[in-house]
């Protein structure tokens, strides 16, 4: 058998490349000095630099919209408190220059919890997995948070109208 098989070398290289890319994509970075703008946007220090972060795959009511202030308070509940370690998993940079990704409070997936508790919508336009839609169905069935209002308007609709 030929040890210099180019197909084997290519396969090995692809496996190594995949490992490097995926391990980097899933690395968590610790955030410091967090301030909350609204239910899906925060400012924080990441590696000593102040950044604006947008929570991936979810959308929350705007502050002037019904349930907007409550949504912000939900996020505060998940992020503020003694001994909470807040981490961030980067996905991309958006057109406004914000870092987009997932927040974790310890092991808790904050983006998921925001939807599950009825504090956010699964953002149909950007959601990549079904888990947020399952969480949203749970919140709707149990009339949690914004789902107490049967006529709740998704933020992307509200923004177009206002």
Regions found by a protein language model. Give the residues of each.
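Small beta-barrel nucleic-acid-binding modules, primarily SNase/OB-fold domains
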Residues: 2-162
